[in-house]
Amino acid sequence: MEGNPQSCEDPEAIKNMSLAEFINQPNVTGFHAQDSGRLRAYVESNPYVRIGTELPGGYVIGYVFEDRFEQLILELQESFVAIRPTLFTLLDRESLESASIIKVQELPAANLRGEGVLLGFVDTGIDYTHPAFLYEDGTSKIQYIWDQTIRGDSPKDMHFGSQYSQAKINEALASKNPFSVVPEQDTNGHGTFLASIAGGRENNNYIGAAPDAEIIAVKLKPASKFNLNFSAVPRGTTAVFTSDKIMLGIKFILDKADELNRPVVICIGLGTNFGGHAGRSIIEEYISHINTRRGIVIISAAGNEANARHHTGGRIPATGNSETIEVLVGENVSSFAA
């Protein structure tokens, strides 16, 4: 059953799938929504939609077959339009430097080393073999890794990806071929860069801002072709992720911090030009809710676009009126070609 897109033609076969089988179908996509009786009733009556994970604050991550997504929105109507995930990509090093994140390292008088604190990263993963994340005895300062791209021992209530504990990471480090034990790799390097800046151990005159803090890292699953095409992302664009997977990454880190009974700082080095940027999207509201909890801080660089004019605003005074907004389209953006 797993991985067979033709099973979408058989409602009975879909009903008999486990949640993990359903989620891992190649033509199933995720969405996020506020939980409600109306949504639950729709899911109960429709075999092509499942609720996967309940999140703090009354939010859920759901899954639907791609060719049923528009039907889902149409039948649940306008209050559910925001269920479609927003696309995020990586903030570059220059943006992080401009936000003064790296300058935290230059405050030795503070004498804050992060002992007893967890650092969480929702990004491209982490190179767990890097010396910046090893103690003097060669063991890892990484408590957990969740690789959303690998099938394996998925976290509780997530139903996809593979998680690795500190014990498993140490087993990998002690072996001749670490990646045969823990196959997670940060092929981009962005997540490793952020983690080393924030929590790298002292190594060759280099030291992170909180070298005694331990780490939980999430390697995000890239956005599907279905989501990229809908948002007119140019062909060949890489390192693009969806807000539903980011929200799940945050939940994973929070769950592990609760298990360890330790405070956590979660770093999200991602940004987007989609949406209103007014704090009212589902992911923004979710993060705002999480930030009210004691012992939890979520931080994100805001970018360095200044007056790049990626957003506009206006007011339509009455129903039936219209306004025209001119859009300047860059070169080689084929989705906006005339």
Where in this protein do the model-derived segments appear?
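Subtilisin-like serine protease catalytic core
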Residues: 108-242
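Generic recognition of flexible, low-complexity loop/linker segments
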Residues: 106-108, 183, 204-206, 286-287, ...
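Autoinhibitory propeptides
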Residues: 1-21, 26, 34-118, 125-141
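Hydrophobic beta-strand segments within beta-rich accessory/binding domains
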Residues: 31, 321-338
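Conserved residues at the C-terminal ends of beta-strands
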Residues: 85, 148, 269
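A generic structural signal for alpha->beta connector loops
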Residues: 48, 79, 139, 212, ...
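Glycine-rich, phosphate-binding/catalytic loops in enzymes
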Residues: 135-141, 283-284, 316-318
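Substrate-binding/access-modulating region of protease and related hydrolase catalytic domains
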Residues: 226-316, 332-337
